[in-house]
Amino acid sequence: MKTRQIKYKFFATLLDAFRNYLQSDAIYEKYWGFSDEPPHTQDEFKVEQFQNLINTINRVPFDSEAADKGTAFNEIVDCIVLHKKSEKIDVSYVTDETGKKIGLQAVYNERTFQFPIELCLEVSRYFREAIPQQYVEAILPTRFGEVLLYGYIDYVAPFCTHDLKTTSSYSVGKYRDHAQHLVYPYCLWKNGADVELFEYNVVELGKKMWQTYTETYTFVPDRDVPRLTTWVEDLIDFIEEHRDLITNKKIFNLE
């Protein structure tokens, strides 16, 4: 791979942030369109989404309890699958009044989360034959030049790749417009691993109850590569239009 030919470097969640910006109006209508007292106006929300996208491009650190909760759960599952102790989070057992182990407590970023042990074991069993946190990358040709797409796949199994999600509320097709089921299968395909199936394995976490769901997608190169290319090229248009706001030189393959 000749890195000097690469014009841009994009990670999958950057494409998601760009999609959220493009769909600002639809997202606003979904959550606050019928609210008598919305937390912000539609124009204010679009400005907020724009800034979120710029921050994502620039890799500005952000604080999110929901993101930390997902990271902690992912790490617990990874450690169970790999039969190892975590170097990222502090984990301890949660017991009931009889001393029975009923959960796992994780401390991450000075936040404490508890997960039912039954849930942790169920999810880890599902991934017992998968490779956790597999780095992938591949070049995507575009009208602007070559773009390096890269990222970490949560779990790679022989016939399917997986992205583990945690959410407080799930609805069918929630991740249909996300980029992972295009970017990661594309990277594997370009590296000679033809793994067509992709799953979003979703854990809906309530205060007392939990539920698991699966969204499955099939990567079809003839259909999906043009979709991915258009998405990436539209993002490049945006980045070049606002280049003066971009401080992350890695985006332009300058470091």
Q: Across the structure, where does each feature detected by a protein language model lie?
A:
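Generic alpha-helical secondary structure signal
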Residues: A12, D25, W32-S35, E97, ...
